[in-house]
Amino acid sequence: MAAVDAILAGKYPAKAHARRVAESLQSHRNGCPGIVYLEAQKTRLIEDNDEPVPFRQRRPFFYLSGCPLSDSCLVYDLSEDQLTLFIPPVDPEDVIWSGLPMSTEQAQNQYDVDRVLVTTELNSTLASIASSHGGKAIAFTIADQVSESTQFHGFSEVNQSVLKGVIEQSRVVKDEYEVALLRKANDISAKAHIAAIKASQTAVNEREIEGAFIATCIANGAREQSYHPIVACGENGAILHYGKNDDTLIDPVTNQKKRNVLIDAGGEYRTYCADITRVIPVGGKFTAETRQIYDIVLQMQTECIAMLKEGVQWEDVHAHAHRVAIRGLLRLGILRGAEDEIFEKRVSVAFFPHGLGHYLGMDTHDTGGNPNYTDKDTMFRYLRVRGRLPAGSVITVEPGVYFCRFIIEPYIKSPESNKYIDTNVLDRYWRVGGVRIEDNVVVTKNGYDNLTTAPKAVDEIERLAVS
C-alpha cells in the first residue's frame, strides 16, 4: 500500500472537483457569472439529550472541499475559479470542553482551496462577489441545505434545482486520489474480513463476528462503517439486508453449528466506502450443499467481472449473471427445463432477486446510477445502475443465490413457474440460506481493476476458518 499512501499524503483534489462541476453548470448559466454555495452538515443534538448525533459529513460539500468539519460552508466563484472555505470561528466556551479547533491557517495548509475564512465573514463575502459581477451572478445551491442566515443579496437568481444532480453525476467517474481512498478502504476491510473469519471458530453468536470486524476496522484507521454490517448465519443469509446480528450460531433443531455465515461489511476510510461480502463455513469446512451454491456464485462473479470495461452495458452483465445461475441450478436439479425458457420466464429471479451491483464511492449506493425501480421486468427492477459503464467508475459485483421461502414459494405455487422448480431437490438447500460474493471493481478503458483482496477461494477461506 506504499503507492496508495503516497497518493493520500497529498491534498484531496477539491479544486479539480469544483472545476468538473463548473464545466457541467455552463449550460445552466447562459453566459452569466455564478457561484456554487454548499454547506457542511450541522452539529445536531440527540433529542432530549445534550450528546451530539453521530456526525456524517454532507457528501456534496466534501466533494468540493475535502473538509470533514461540521458547521462549515464553501463558495466557489465559477468565473474567477476561486474556491473559498469558511470554517467556524473559535468559541471560547467550546474550547473548555473540546480544545482549540482548526485555525484558518491550518485549514489553508490541509485543504485544496484558495482561501479560508471564518463563517462570520460569509455574508459580506457573498455581497462582495455579487457586487463584483454587477448583480448578474447566479447562486447555485441545494434545496433544504441552506441556512436561513445565509444572504444572497445582489444575485440575479438563486437556483436550487440543478446543482445536486450535477454533483451526483460528476461523482460517478473517480480520479486517482478517490481510487486510492477506495483501495485503502478495501485493504482495511479485507483485514477485517479475515479477522471475522477467524472469529467464527469460537463465536457462538453473530455479534461476536461483527465485533471482530468493527474492531479491526477501527484499529486500522477506518473508524466508521460504510453501512450497518450484515452478519447472517444459516437461513438468515437469505435476508438481503439482515440487520439483527444477534442470532446464535447453534441450530436449535440439530443442536449443531449452523452451516455458514454471510458477512456483508465494509469500513469507511476518510469518507470513502468499501462494500465486501463473503460467506464462511462455521465448522471450518463448507457442507456439500453450501459448496455447490458457492461454486455457482463464484462462477457468476468471475464471468461478470471478466466482462467489465469502458462502455459495457450493465444490463448485459446482470443478465449474464442470471444465465450462469440458471445453468448451475439446472446442473444441481433445483431447476428443470430449458435454459432459455427459464430465463425468459424470469424464474431465476426467485433465487437471485436483486441487482448485480451499484456504484461505490462516498456512499455505499453511490450516485449517478439512474435506477428504474418501476421497471415491470422483475429481472431489472432492482438494478441500481442502468446503462453503459464509463472508465473510472467503481462498481460492486455481487451476485448471489438465495433460498428465501417468502420469495420462492410464490413461484412454486404459480402455474407459470412451478414446473421449472423441483421442490424435492430444493428441500435440501433451504438451510444454506444465501450465498453472495461481492468485490469492488474499477472500470478501465480496456478492462478492470479489482480493489478487493479479501479471500474468496474455498481452500483459503476454509484454511483461515480453522487457523
Swiss-Prot record:
Mn(2+) 2 binds at D264, D275, E438. It is an enzyme of class 3 (hydrolase). Mn(2+) 1 binds at D275, E398, E438. It catalyses: Release of any N-terminal amino acid, including proline, that is linked to proline, even from a dipeptide or tripeptide. It comes from the Eukaryota. Its cofactor is Mn(2+). The keyword Metal-binding applies. Keywords: Aminopeptidase, Hydrolase, Manganese, Metal-binding, Metalloprotease, Protease. GO terms for molecular function: manganese ion binding; metalloaminopeptidase activity. GO terms for biological process: proteolysis. The keyword ATP-binding does not apply. Binds 2 manganese ions per subunit. Its EC number is 3.4.11.9. SMART domains: AMP_N (SM01011). CDD domains: Prolidase. Belongs to the peptidase M24B family. Catalyzes the removal of a penultimate prolyl residue from the N-termini of peptides. This is Probable Xaa-Pro aminopeptidase pepP. It comes from Neosartorya fischeri (strain ATCC 1020 / DSM 3700 / CBS 544.65 / FGSC A1164 / JCM 1740 / NRRL 181 / WB 181) (Aspergillus fischerianus). The gene is pepP.
